[in-house]
């Protein structure tokens, strides 16, 4: 017997679909400040059950975090999927993200936040990831760092700061506006993610949090479902 499933989603520029008969499926709803309610799903396998036991909470926290600071999540569903160990990292798509297995719930929490954040920075604000990597990875990492700060955690940031300072001294640093293919190894991760995030932090301090938030929310309002560059 053939089973046909049909999926439709407006206002997206990318698509992915995942299936595994072994998936444990968790479901809850998330209520945003406006009163809008969205469906939240997480999918994982038995070996990751302990690490993923709070995955719904992490996903809901991330959706509310980005919605409150940048702009309301426009879709009706968000899903987080555990991929195979060979996958290596996380990959974002509109309304859904896939992650490789994590060693701890702490790292899973922040990986979920980062990948869900890409719904805003790459998904809704459809920048050119390869030409302007900082506009999705840098901006997204900035808001992920705020997510960490809310939980009094600075996961990995001290190491990145030390690396950046070393690269600057050794003159191996590159501008945040460098295109992806022109980054030296390991500058893509260090510059496009971390350095761009620190630049956003300095900009917020210069403008003041209220003005900065208003500017970013206006950017979101004007450019959602478009391709800023």
List the predicted regions and their residue ranges.
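Hydrophobic helix-coil surface modules that form long, contiguous segments used
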Residues: 1-113, 142
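Active-site-adjacent bridging/hinge elements
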Residues: 34-38, 89-91, 114-119, 166-180
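Second-shell loop/turn segments in exported
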Residues: 44-54, 129-130, 186-189, 202, ...
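Zinc-dependent metallopeptidase catalytic helix centered on the HExxH motif
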Residues: 57, 97-158, 216
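Metalloprotease/metallohydrolase-associated module, dominated by Zn2+-dependent proteases
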Residues: 64, 169-197
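Active-site-adjacent structural elements in folded domains
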Residues: 82-84, 103-107, 179-188, 201, ...
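Secondary-structure capping and boundary motifs in well-ordered enzyme cores
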Residues: 91, 104-113, 132-135, 139, ...
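Amphipathic alpha-helical substructures
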Residues: 189-229
């Amino acid at each position: 017997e053939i089973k046909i499933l049909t999926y439709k989603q407006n206002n997206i520029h990318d698509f992915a679909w995942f299936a595994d008969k072994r998936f444990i499926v968790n479901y809850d709803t998330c209520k945003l400040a406006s009163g809008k309610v969205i469906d939240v799903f997480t999918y994982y396998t038995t070996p990751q059950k302990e690490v993923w036991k709070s995955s719904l909470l992490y996903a809901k926290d991330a959706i509310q975090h980005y919605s409150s600071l940048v702009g309301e999540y426009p879709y009706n569903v968000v899903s987080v999927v555990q991929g195979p160990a060979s996958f290596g990292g996380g990959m974002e798509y509109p309304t859904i993200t896939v992650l490789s297995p994590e060693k701890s719930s702490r790292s899973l929490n922040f990986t979920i936040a980062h990948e869900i954040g890409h719904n805003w920075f790459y998904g809704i604000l459809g920048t050119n990831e390869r030409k302007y990597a900082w506009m999705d990875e840098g901006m997204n990492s900035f808001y992920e760092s705020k997510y960490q700060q809310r939980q009094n955690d600075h996961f990995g940031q001290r190491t990145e700061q030390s690396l950046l300072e070393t690269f600057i001294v050794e003159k191996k640093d590159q501008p945040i506006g460098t295109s992806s293919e022109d980054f030296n190894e390991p500058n893509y991760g260090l510059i496009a993610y971390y350095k761009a995030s620190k630049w956003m932090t300095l900009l917020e301090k210069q403008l003041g949090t209220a003005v900065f938030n208003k500017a970013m929310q206006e950017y979101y309002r004007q450019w959602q479902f478009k391709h800023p560059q």
